Every structure is written in C-alpha cells, then in structure tokens.
C-alpha cells in the first residue's frame, strides 16, 4: 500500500460529542459561561432551473440561505445574561422611544455607529478531551427572539431557568484554532 493511501484515511476515530462546546459574544461575555445548548445553523443552496426538452434540471447558482443561530443558556440568579440579550433586543426594536435605538448604536466615544447594533460570536468546538479543535465564527449577530421565563410556585423541585435566543447574522465560517479555514 502506498503512503499516499494512508494520508487519505481518517486518523482520529473518536466521534464528536454534543457536549463539547463553548459560546461567547464579543460584547456580552456573561452569556457564554451559562450556555448549555447551541445549534450550528442549516445552510441551504437554492437552485436555478435549467429547462430542457425532456425534464427541467436543477443546477446550483442561486443564493445561499443561512438558518437562525439558536442558543439555550441558563439564566443566572441576577438575570444579568438574560437582561443583556433583553436590552439588546429592546434597543433594536425601540418600543418606547427612538432613544433606545440611539443608545444601542452609540459607541464609547459617543459617536453614532450602526455596527454597534451587531456583535460577532464564536462557537468553540471541543474534542473528547475538552480541547478546542475548531471555531464557528458568526459575523454581525443580532437577536430576533428571546423566550419567556415561566415562574410557577407549584413546582415541588427546584428547576433552574433556561432561555432560548435566536440570532440572525450575515455569515458563519468554520475555521481551525488558528483561524484558517478547515
């Protein structure tokens, strides 16, 4: 057998674990510590139709469509991580006044910058030894939904709150630990 054949075979036979991940948002560091579920979004390529005499044929050539990025996180006792997302979402929707939008789109130098409404995020994928092996880098994230917190005094066991947040974004890339494409 040639040495070339050995290079094309799988070297690591361990399987990727669903519990091996960490997520962080550049502007909101309190959210990452409590994350307990994340979904790498669906990626869909629409097709163009090439008409032919017998049958229309699908061919690649349309736009890529990225699904929402959803994250489930444990809500801390002071609700700091929940309120970070809540305030961000309310600021984007400005339900009471346009000042809320101005507050979220003003940078630390008191200059208007619409990029302040967005935030980059990184999902770090870990191996079976909990060492980082890859990153999913999301560009220009912004929240579009945040689940409710349902208080219930009839629960006999202590249940800790989790919240789901859905983000829209521009694009995501999967890179190695150095930032190079896989």
Language-model-detected regions and their locations in the chain:
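Glycine-rich, low-complexity intrinsically disordered segments
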Residues: 1-182
């Amino acid at each position: 057998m040639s040495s070339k054949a050995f290079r094309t075979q799988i070297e690591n036979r361990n399987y990727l674990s669903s519990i091996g991940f960490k997520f962080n948002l550049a502007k909101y560091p309190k959210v990452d510590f409590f994350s307990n579920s994340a979904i790498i979004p669906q990626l869909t390529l629409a097709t163009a139709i090439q008409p032919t005499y017998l049958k229309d044929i699908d061919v690649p050539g349309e736009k890529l469509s990225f699904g929402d990025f959803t994250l489930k996180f444990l809500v801390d006792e002071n609700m700091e991580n929940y309120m970070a997302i809540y305030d961000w979402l309310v600021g984007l929707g400005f339900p009471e006044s346009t000042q809320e939008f101005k507050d979220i789109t003003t940078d630390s130098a008191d200059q208007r910058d619409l990029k302040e409404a967005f935030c980059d995020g990184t999902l770090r994928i870990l191996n079976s030894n909990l060492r980082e092996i890859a990153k999913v880098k999301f560009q220009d994230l912004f929240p579009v939904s945040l689940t409710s917190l349902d208080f219930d005094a009839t629960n006999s066991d202590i249940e800790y709150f989790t919240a789901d947040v859905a983000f829209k974004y521009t694009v995501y890339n999967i890179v190695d630990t150095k930032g190079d494409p896989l």
